[in-house]
Amino acid sequence: MNNWSIDDARASYNVNYWSQGLYGISDEGEVTVSPDPNRPDCKIGLNELAKDMVKAGVALPVLVRFPQILHHRVNSLCQAFNQAIQKYKYEADYLLVYPIKVNQQQTVVEEILASQVEKEVPQLGLEAGSKPELLAVLAMAQKASSVIICNGYKDKEYIRLALIGEKLGHKVYIVLEKMSELKVVLEQAKELGVTPRLGLRVRLAFQGKGKWQASGGEKSKFGLSAAQVLKVIELLQHEEMLDSLELLHFHLGSQIANIRDIRQGVSEAGRFYCELMKLGAQVKCFDVGGGLAVDYDGTRSQSNNSMNYGLTEYANNIVSVLTDMCKEYEQPMPRIISESGRYLTAHHAVLLTDVIGTESYKPETILPPSEDAPLLLQNMWQSWTEVSGKADQRALIEIFHDCQSDLTEVHSLFALGQLSLADRAWAEQINLRVCHELQGSMSSKYRYHRPIIDELNEKLADKFFVNFSLFQSLPDAWGIDQVFPVMPLSGLDKAPERRAVMLDITCDSDGIVDQYVDGQGIETTLPVPAWTQESPYLIGFFLVGAYQEILGDMHNLFGDTNSAVVRVDENGRRNIDSVLEGDTVADVLRYVNLEAVSFMRTYEELVNKHIVADERSNILEELQLGLKGYTYLEDFS
């Protein structure tokens, strides 16, 4: 592809769309990051960043965080709602609440809070869904608006901690998820002498579409039915505490791709709000929960990995629906709250790592079968002569199907003992040779070729063995088929010569990335430059800032990766603020109740028993260094 350009590279990886202007490809073919889209010239190359960190002693893989991206996302979301409020003349304000379950890392939470430190009236609060999260939030919420929303199932201790939060000066909303919580809240509030701020999570009939759609609808795990809502109102009236009900909450699920689903959910919840107000409640806050999606594949579609709306459209729909409904039913307009954790955090983190080796198909000269070879092998050779003889486009399809059918029969006959190992090896090689020739002869401009091209690309793809654990760093790719953009960090100024799949270093066949963002949608292979030991390059996994760290699993005892916080100044210079070392082998052993200290004693006994005296100290030192070392590969050259 002699006319390859950087624009072709950008289109091939769809980077201009999924990156939201935060990541790009330079004219030199290197992947860059611009943490502040308002200053696109202030960008740095990720390849050079990774190499410099390695020189400084930070081993790959490393998770790099860009806090300026967090700041930008917070302010963009607040700005979108502020503009919508002004546009529709909405008579209340907006508050962005960050649910820390999305990423509880202290650096992340503190940077989100710091994004509005200069605002006279911060539009930022925090959400907790468990006792540990609440205890963390109680220590941090004062850095913003001091608004805390308590979701999830609650016991007496959780509720007391939330009420204590009020005594500490926070505004803590205890959202009732089930009927039994109300009694405990009222009892503990009375005992502590605190007037509680109550919220109701309503269970909507409407259910949004997506991987997390079970979060909403009548069968939802959380929330109160219409009858239960009325019962809560009755109990609060009886206790003369109806004015404590200040918040209405609903949740359609994470990653809602269709704006119509959001609009319909807000509309139904808005009716709940108006009815509660008619019953005498003084609800002040309307919490739409999560659902604001991230366009992981950049297709701006209704797929599970995308969204068919933008930030402005999201805010406009919520504000306009509530404006119209409050006017129609003559009710005051409540403060709008959203819990948009995925949107805030996904883009800010990228995993940078190295390729430790590749396995690729290289065409070989294959001799024809002997005259007395089985007819099946003769047929496969005939397929090869036809495809190498430049068969017409429609004949190529027949050749492909014939060759695949023949190979299947070869495997069956080998299992029955009717073909030798040499016969099988020859058949597999000629099949690959035919497929390779077909791959070069078929064209995606023919619709009937496209599914076969996809199959050929997958069959002939290079295998890239990448220094990371899918289960630790991209658990959603394995667990729910989430798509994450993947790109080589350099060499993109040249046309990709290969297609590849990324395999991790765990001993598990599921440790493979099997979906890739492509300019044409989602593909099963990734276009890449040729990789060799002499001209290697690094790989980046993008949009991994939401959920992946906390959901990561220590399969094969691969632990947390190294991580770094990086900023880019107004002159385009990078500053590495901090580096957090990943887990050592001793760390991960301790997680599963294996003690490195006792292992060292055992090693000493074995060394003294089996190793000659002049080698003992070196062997022991190497074992000790192994326990102190990184869980990922460090020396594979």
UniProtKB/Swiss-Prot annotation:
Catalyzed chemical reaction(s): L-arginine + H(+) = agmatine + CO2
Residues involved in substrate binding: F286, D287, V288, G289, G290, G291, L292, A293, V294, D295, Y296
Domain of life where this protein originates: Bacteria
Cofactors demanded by this protein: Mg(2+); pyridoxal 5'-phosphate
Annotated positions of the N6-(pyridoxal phosphate)lysine modification: K101
UniProt GO MF annotations: arginine decarboxylase activity; metal ion binding
CDD domains tied to this protein: PLPDE_III_ADC
Disulfide topology: none
InterPro entries according to UniProt: Ala_racemase/Decarboxylase_C (IPR009006), Arg_decarb_HB (IPR040634), Arg_decarbox_C (IPR041128), Arg_decrbxlase (IPR002985), De-COase2_N (IPR022644), Orn/DAP/Arg_de-COase (IPR000183), PLP-binding_barrel (IPR029066)
Pathway: Amine and polyamine biosynthesis; agmatine biosynthesis; agmatine from L-arginine: step 1/1
Pfam families: Arg_decarb_HB, Arg_decarbox_C, Orn_Arg_deC_N
EC number in record: 4.1.1.19
Gene Ontology BP term (one): spermidine biosynthetic process
Keywords (A to Z) from UniProt: Decarboxylase, Lyase, Magnesium, Metal-binding, Polyamine biosynthesis, Pyridoxal phosphate, Spermidine biosynthesis
UniProt family annotation: Belongs to the Orn/Lys/Arg decarboxylase class-II family. SpeA subfamily.
Biological role: Catalyzes the biosynthesis of agmatine from arginine.
Name of the molecule in the record: Biosynthetic arginine decarboxylase
Taxonomic source organism: Shewanella piezotolerans (strain WP3 / JCM 13877)
Lineage, broadest ranks: Bacteria, Pseudomonadati, Pseudomonadota, Gammaproteobacteria, Alteromonadales
